[in-house]
Amino acid sequence: MDKLIIGGVEIKNRLFVGSGKYPSNEIIKDVLEGSGSQVITLALRRVDLDNKEEDILQNIPKDVILLPNTSGATNAEEAIRIARIARAMGCGNWIKIEVISDSKYLLPDNEETIKATKVLADEGFIVLPYMCPDLYAGRRLIEAGAAAVMPLGAPIGSNRGLKTKELIQIMIDELDIPIIVDAGIGKPSQAMEAMEIGAAACLVNTAIASSEDPINMARAFKMAVEGGRLAYEAKMGRESKFGNASSPLTGFLD
């Protein structure tokens, strides 16, 4: 069974969760417990060290890896600045690069993301860039020092599932780096599908946070991700356009 290691850390639970859109910060601790997640993303604007009641960090256990994102950055320079601020605030060396200048579809800018990845990786950050799935961009991100890449399944927050499945599959097949499917996953079955094709992990936020019961939805996603990974490792049987009986069709009445 393959291990998922990012930045020298073994990640045993392949479901990453986000911290936005919940009805309150207090529920996040229960979601983390239900999901079993070891990694949580957060936007810096939700970290308030001067107000413990509003500070999201008060609800995240110390053993959970913080993955601050550069939400709000529209170019590489802004992403780099946000990442440095996150580290200075004590959020650690992990960073999820988000560079988005498109306000309608919220698609990441791969070129600016590559630039930011290079600078931050050289500064010792564990860089996980959010990207539009593309084999060539993935290769360049690896060359720039990315620890993993995070291609979108569908536009962020859309809950539309794996609309980019074939492109993600190509990246999984061709790139020797963890591929973490991020954005667009709306159902546990869609997370399972991503894991079945060989994704190293899934990041889910909106589908959990916007459900009527986020804690149980987190549990459902945990089981889906585990099941999908197990199916991938078990090497599923090939598809066929013809029927193939599972029981003998001859000999019994001869």
From Swiss-Prot:
Which SUPFAM superfamilies would you find in this protein's record?
ThiG-like (SSF110399)
Where is this protein primarily located? cytoplasm
| Residues that coordinate or bind 1-deoxy-D-xylulose 5-phosphate | G157, A183, G184, N205, T206
Q: Superkingdom, according to UniProt?
A: Bacteria
Q: Which GO terms describe its biological process?
A: thiamine diphosphate biosynthetic process
Q: Where in the cell does this protein reside?
A: Cytoplasm
According to its UniProt record, which residues of this chain constitute the active site? K96
**Self-association and partners:** Homotetramer. Forms heterodimers with either ThiH or ThiS.
Q: Which family does it belong to?
A: Belongs to the ThiG family.
**What is this protein's function?**
Catalyzes the rearrangement of 1-deoxy-D-xylulose 5-phosphate (DXP) to produce the thiazole phosphate moiety of thiamine. Sulfur is provided by the thiocarboxylate moiety of the carrier protein ThiS. In vitro, sulfur can be provided by H(2)S.
Please state what the protein is called: Thiazole synthase
What gene is it encoded by?
thiG
